[in-house]
Amino acid sequence: LRAERVYIRPLAVALVKKLSFGVIGCGNVANNYYLPYIARNHELVAVADTISERARRSAELWGAVKWYEDPDKLLSDPRVEAVVIVTSHESHAPLAIRAAEEGKHFVVQKPMALSLKAAEEIVRKVEKSGVVAVAEPSDPLLSPLFRALKSELAGLGRHCYSLWHTGHSGPTWSEAFFDDAKGGGVLFDLAVYDVARLVTLFGEPNRVAALGSVLMEERLVLKPEEATTAIRRDTYGRGVYYFHDLKPSVPVKVTAFDDFAGILDYGGGLAVTLANYVTFTQLHMPPIQLYFTEGAVSVHPYAPLIVVRAKSGERSLGREQIGEIKPYYHASIDHLAECVAKGEKPLPSVEWGYKVTKVLLALNEAAKTGKTVSLA
């Protein structure tokens, strides 16, 4: 095994014409990741949020030319070439469809849709309009970490089983994350990351089974005005900010799964995905572990990033071998701009997003009915 191999395929962002962006949804993710990156590396033309004060504050903080309360007005703004959709889950698909109808390139946050019908409509509209559309989370296709992982798995034989875990204590800035009717819960918010990785590495599973539970029946979230007034220079303007200085006080009833376990059957090889909103800390264990007939691989959030144990020996890959790993939000923006400039189809396309959505919905059905759901 050669340790000097390098997997990174740098995106030629410096050579790509900057795009004029509009961002729909001015919440935590937008202000932490998309807005500051676009403002630094592209052109931020406009922002929109149904809470007008959030739009105004975000525009002022990041230098957007215009702000809107109505997303449709942003979508019809001729100065906007591309949009980022980072709203609550139930509005992702309608806004993606509208963006395509308006001829706007777009990045849509996960989940792309909450029904197969909506996902199919997005695919149709994108194909008809010819816009470039990126479905999040893009890291399974854009991150050099997962390109390296895929390369390492190629020589390890048959997939036997794998464990995939994502969890934290839960978001405090919106009640929508806990509302099943709004597409809330850990499946669509957190398990989606590992489902997207599994679909990229192994394709669609033959069948899935799942269990979901509501471990904490009531949660506390911030007052909407608290999340709004937090948009200022001494919070997001200084770096990534997650309301550490604010105490949630508004009780909300939890109707969406906050604890979830899914099993994906790949022709006998089983992948187990675990996601939760209830862990206050994380153990120092690899969140991704894969076991094959000829070896095993673990992926770590700290160095070394990948550890491979095979019959031929053991080796580790760090940042030196793998390359720069951008936050996927940033990689998606640059990839969209590159694809627009070159007239190419993006890797995390809406067709790929459709496959991820199909598996997510099957897992949701399995968890709610207690039955195994076939995808074959």
Regions found by a protein language model. Name each.
Residues V240, D245-S332:
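NAD(P)-dinucleotide binding in Rossmann-like oxidoreductases
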Residues F177-A271, Y277-Q282, E351:
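Rossmann-like dinucleotide-binding domain that binds NAD(P)(H)
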Residues W62-K125, L142:
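Beta-loop-alpha module in the N-terminal Rossmann-like domain of NAD(P)-dependent dehydrogenases
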Residues Y7-W62:
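N-terminal Rossmann-like dinucleotide-binding module
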Residues V108-Q109, A133-A135, L274, V299:
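Hydrophobic residues in well-ordered beta-strands that form the structural core
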Residues V6-L15, V23, A82-V84, G267, ...:
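C-terminal helix-rich "cap/oligomerization" subdomain common to oxidoreductases
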Residues P10-L11, A113-E175, D194:
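A contiguous active-site-proximal alpha/beta segment in oxidoreductase catalytic domains
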